[in-house]
Design a protein with these regions (language model features):
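Juxtamembrane/disordered regions of integral membrane proteins
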Residues: 10-142
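Short, Lys/Arg-enriched N-terminal segments with co-localized hydrophobic residues
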Residues: 1-11
Length: 142
């Protein structure tokens, strides 16, 4: 059974939104991880870091995080025309804040510089990725 025009549009929008948001998020985060986060975390908790990183858990996080971002923020904004930056920043602050502030609270060698850097980065990265993914989707498939 062939898809209807509205069904095709739905899947095109969802696909472009997911792929563009994920690509932007992954590319920017990869750059930041290599240039800033890895040296920062190595300086403070190097003995705890896996080398090489475990790819499967990282992939699962990225796939689920982008899916959650689309579900909670980007898709509703696409459908309603609502702005996306503030809502996405809140999601980023909550997600990265949960990790960083909990780690700082319970781990002896967790440094405040790690908390601030990763918290701000996660907030900005999430907001920008959602905004850019939405802009690409609106520009290409409406």
């Amino acid at each position: 059974m062939a898809l209807t025009v509205p069904q095709r549009r739905f899947f095109m929008q969802l696909g472009v939104l997911y792929v563009s948001t994920a690509a932007i998020f992954l590319i920017l985060d990869g750059i930041m991880l290599m240039l800033v986060m890895k040296p920062l975390f190595t300086r403070h908790i190097g003995a705890l870091m896996a080398d090489p990183i475990r790819g499967v858990p990282a992939l699962l996080f990225y796939a689920a995080y982008v899916a959650g971002l689309l579900y909670l923020v980007s898709w509703p904004a696409l459908k309603s025309g609502a702005p996306v930056v503030i809502s996405a920043a809140v999601i980023g602050a909550m997600a990265y804040g949960t990790y960083e502030f909990t780690s700082y609270a319970i781990m002896r060698d967790w440094h405040v510089q790690m908390v601030i850097t990763d918290f701000v980065w996660g907030t900005v990265l999430t907001a920008f990725s959602a905004w850019a993914g939405l802009a690409i989707t609106r520009a290409t498939v409406g």
